[in-house]
Curated annotation (Swiss-Prot):
One of its GO terms (molecular function) is heme binding. It holds the Pfam family Cytochrom_C_asm. The chain crosses the membrane at residues 5-19, 32-52. Its main location: plastid. It comes from Oenothera berteroana. InterPro entries: Cyt_c_assembly, Cyt_c_biogenesis_CcsA/CcmC. It is a multi-pass membrane protein. The keyword Repeat does not apply. Required during biogenesis of c-type cytochromes (cytochrome c6 and cytochrome f) at the step of heme attachment. May interact with Ccs1. This is Cytochrome c biogenesis protein CcsA. Coiled coil: none annotated.
Length: 65
């Protein structure tokens, strides 16, 4: 299911973000880049996956007719 896959990708990205924030070896710019990528992934998960219209949650897809 694409929504579950992209939700997993989102959770993974923000787990990476939390690890970059708590690890003193990484600079703050690295965590800002990861947070920005996580924000982009959230937009893909919210809008892009709904445009696919496949999977178990296809009732929540946009109609482009």
């Amino acid at each position: 299911d694409p929504k579950e896959t992209w939700a997993f990708i989102t959770w993974t990205m923000f787990a990476i973000y939390l690890h970059t924030r708590t690890n003193p070896n990484f600079q703050s710019a690295n965590s800002a880049i990861v947070a920005f990528l996580g924000f982009i992934i959230i937009w893909i998960c919210y809008f892009g996956v709904n445009l696919l219209g496949i999977g178990l949650h296809s009732y929540g897809s946009f109609n482009l007719h």
